[in-house]
Amino acid sequence: MRVPAAVTGGCGCGVDGGGGCCRGGGKLADWEEGKDDEMKSVVVKGWTRMAQVVPLHDNASAEDDDDDEEDDDEDDDDDDDEDDEEEAAPPYVMAVDDSSVDRAVITALLRRSKYRDSGKRALEILGSEPNVSMIITDYWMPEMTGYDLLKKIKESSELKQIPVVIMSSENVPTRISRCLEEGAEDFLLKPVRPADISRITSRMLQ
């Protein structure tokens, strides 16, 4: 776990500079339209206005293998394909943030997106969604802070094994230390960079 350096650069939209800015850019719009139609995406309700579950990679190769298999019984084929798809389900990240811009940024960096508005159901979804492998949450949100969400997750015997990453635009050492001591996997300072997302997702998938 690292304690990040001071925040520098960026336009305040949550994207590190260099052509990826969400203000009027085309890159983010592509992801918002769900350019990768074959990707599976589960939309959930969050602690503020939205929480989104984003698959980190597809299971196209597993589905291709299913297509190559032949069986005389068509019904059995369908059942087998469904079972294989369930077994090949990709890991998911739940992004929780009261800022629609920051949610979209995280989604774009994770390269899979389909989402809509929702309410306060993050913990409920965590209890019923077995494929959630990591949670990325903003620290400062109305109604429930990311720190409070972290505490509830770590207090749950069923959820405490899920890595939680906290994000914040404020570099407050005491806040960072408190989150890490409470069990946060990492603490990211906004604007979140692609390298940050790559680092934490690579570590999670090992």
From Swiss-Prot:
Cystines in this chain: none
UniProt KW Iron keyword: no
Post-translational modification: Two-component system major event consists of a His-to-Asp phosphorelay between a sensor histidine kinase (HK) and a response regulator (RR). In plants, the His-to-Asp phosphorelay involves an additional intermediate named Histidine-containing phosphotransfer protein (HPt). This multistep phosphorelay consists of a His-Asp-His-Asp sequential transfer of a phosphate group between first a His and an Asp of the HK protein, followed by the transfer to a conserved His of the HPt protein and finally the transfer to an Asp in the receiver domain of the RR protein.
Pfam families: Response_reg (PF00072)
Acyltransferase keyword on record: no
Domain of life from the UniProt record: Eukaryota
Gene Ontology terms describing biological process: cytokinin-activated signaling pathway; phosphorelay signal transduction system; response to cytokinin
InterPro entries according to UniProt: ARR-like (IPR045279), CheY-like_superfamily (IPR011006), Sig_transdc_resp-reg_receiver (IPR001789)
Function: Functions as a response regulator involved in His-to-Asp phosphorelay signal transduction system. Phosphorylation of the Asp residue in the receiver domain activates the ability of the protein to promote the transcription of target genes. Type-A response regulators seem to act as negative regulators of the cytokinin signaling.
Entry similarity comment: Belongs to the ARR family. Type-A subfamily.
The protein's name: Two-component response regulator ORR7
Natural source organism: Oryza sativa subsp. indica (Rice)
Gene: RR7
